[in-house]
């Protein structure tokens, strides 16, 4: 307290604690982690909560191929806060971490690791390299998660490569196939030419690309219904005008699609006629920079042109004019270039016209085949410019506009993808879509917009392409008849494959021939033959992770189905949330989760996406090294994670300051609890001063706020309530006011303050334990213990409101007292500015009061009132006087206190020297020293 040494310093009860002001978290946290591991914290916590209601937060498996980033840290810490809080709230909340271990990124890493040998290794050898890579990264990522303070069963995580997982996944596939939800067919799918595999919608990301949009004319070759003759239009000079942004698909053109409900016009340019939608004539002419043209005759219904024929722009074949409702007037010409092999709408409309072939002149690597004629061997992206140049030279191109548009990219390699019709395995969403809608309605979505988002995605999505033309994954468990090629999936084959995988893992698919796997007696339903081959595709990794509700929730004895919560980032609405929902509804008829909680992306301090190339990223390891994991955890709690969360070095620096204020509150209290034994030194409630009861009432309000925040997973609310309590209620008020009582007195008055502070810190520490898991344990270790307190704070019960609650009259009284104190502080500041006083203890305050204010202030003993104002003397005077204040009926005047300054407590008093042995002490301090 004193800056200058005094002979009485040793008689003061100055704060004394080994709890350090500087946190030193980067060094302390690893020691705590070691202690938690040696004492088996997680498993003992589960035993401690055995028999309590369960809360199951099911972990969405991160991909096991690299170090964690800030987004992963955000995700895992949110989960850990929930798990810790639920375990303190009266639940047994196990946490089984999972890892997604199959898929293309790992396969590509494995291939790159073998270099030139990749052409020589077998599929089985490649899979073994992949498994080794995935397993190594599981260990790396697990250590990184634990370093963040995440607790869970890391000794027994669930892995999608485990035999028992793969076996259960096969069974889910079989259940869906049995219900008719799995089929194989030719359809256009997202295809990555670089990865050489089909992709699901969840594996697509959109980026802005430059492209040439062109208007191309196709010459009419046949008019079987005499439409042109009817309107006096010469067929040999008539063209349909199409618009496309994918020039490379023109070799696959087999039809031009019109809308039968739209009107079309004949536009004469020179002596040639061009058919296009009436409403789009002007925009087409403007785009083609054609100013001299004439619309001939009246508009014609699009339906009249059906089944006309036209010549391909360069190949020796004819196409068909067909009708489709997907044709709009939003852009283009109203005549849609239709290549059934390269577009979903195109494919679907062509299915209505059996005479229209599906042509796919592009191979797995994105190269045009001989079906493209002279462009065979060209990569599709290069072919765009070559075909455009040739068609422009031939006069087929009427106009060209360079545009930027959003184009789909592979989220693995980030390169543009194409639509390509191939034989693939699909999950028929259309067959159970209504059931999915009903399941969505049973789920609690947080934020609530998640309900409509998921419903909209399910409504708009096509059938799910679940096959991939790769090696590292769970094989499609299908057999093919050698004689007729029909695929074969039965209950018996599914059981045989599942049993085999459970015993040997999915590598067995590559070890044995089909006849060694398929049960004896299986015959082809179509031709009766019994010789077989195996499917060579693997399942989409989203089918892997989408099966966790069966392979994990139903199989692990400590878990249950459905989960109470799935919690992931917003991108999982098209990923894990959705794949899990689809497989669960398809196999069980219900959602796999009762609630879904969603968080946003991590962005930089300016709100921009983090990229290594931009140099705006920040790594969890950097923050841990500089500040400790608790600061990352505080960042998570202080953020509104339902939207994008900003992260950066400045933000973490600011948070470290906020953390310091919370830590110093705890340190001050611990320092003043030196020598305090809660088993013997706690005073009864009626011995507490009013301000102590006010502090406990403020604590009760904190409990109410934080309980409410935790209940709805609003940790931002918890953080702000804790921060304001520590800074405003404690440091700026209660702890400041009680310093004289703590430092300068002994007996009941001091013990009353210590009693309140002890209860405050015990409660506060429990409240922050789910968030600041390391710091709260450090505080807990320094707190004096009572019987029944656990070694680890996470084993304690979360505080419940009511124990320290005060009635509204008491709260109103103290709100008024604090308002009076604020007015006194203003006057003291003015007196300090005028050099009347220095420190506030040099002041004597006169309060001029009306009757109501007088009665309020007079209800507090004058020495306690002086302590409340942190002055040496307070006098109450009925009537007007002093400076007017914001408190009605109150005037405030301040003067230098009379008497001398006590060497020990620094208060001014006229009792200085009243004890001859202590001539520099006030009577109060002299009696304390002599006691």
What is each stretch, according to the model?
Residues 189, 407, 478, 521, ...:
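Residues immediately within or flanking Cys/His clusters that coordinate Zn2+
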Residues 255, 262-335, 344-348:
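Protease-associated
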Residues 47-109, 242-251, 257, 322-349, ...:
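N-terminal catalytic cores of NTP/NDP-binding nucleotidyl/phosphoryl-transfer enzymes
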Residues 100, 189, 193, 199-207, ...:
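Acidic, turn-prone loop/beta-hairpin segments
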Residues 2-25, 31, 35-39, 111-251, ...:
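Residue patterns forming the tRNA-binding/recognition surfaces of aminoacyl-tRNA synthetases
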Residues 192, 410, 481, 524-527, ...:
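Short cysteine-rich clusters marking metal-coordination/redox-active sites
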Residues 196, 469, 485, 528-529, ...:
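Cys/His-coordinated zinc-binding microdomains
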Residues 222, 319, 353-366, 470-472, ...:
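Alpha-helical recognition segments enriched in aromatics with Gly/Pro capping
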